[in-house]
Amino acid sequence: MIAYKGMCPGMICLGYQLKMGLNVTEQANCQANGFHCAANPMDCLRYYGDFQNSEYYLVRPCGDLDEDAVDSRISCTQLWVLRKLEPQEFFLHALAYMADHPQMPDGCDVKRERAQAWNGYAVVRGKHPRAKGKLGDILAFAREAVNGPKIEHLSLCVIDGKERLPDVW
């Protein structure tokens, strides 16, 4: 299983220093302990929402696993930290998750049909998704089929001031 983990810069999570590779702890309970991660990348933003001052990693949860009904959160006793995701990669993974799981909740910060970037990004899903943002913002789009929630098209762009202009839908 592949999952995602948000952290403070330097791979710090609630005061705990993680490292690349295998990290081990004794217990896993989503409410209290263990290494936490999420199956849906967007759920990381619920816990590490300051996108400009957080880091996001591709991880593999192992050992004892615990899940709860809050979101796609997972707690585990063994967490393999595989690699850091660049901002655009993070949102591409989020779009892929939506396409692979069209019936699942979209996760934190996914807007329906129309979104304005905030905190450096906008993720929008719908029949005719539109978004706008400031210079440097990342815009991620998931277009649904006309007759259902299946994702037909994914796209991602960065407002660069040349091909993609600021504050234009």
List the predicted regions and their residue ranges.
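Short, glycine-biased loop/turn motifs at secondary-structure junctions and
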Residues: M1-W169
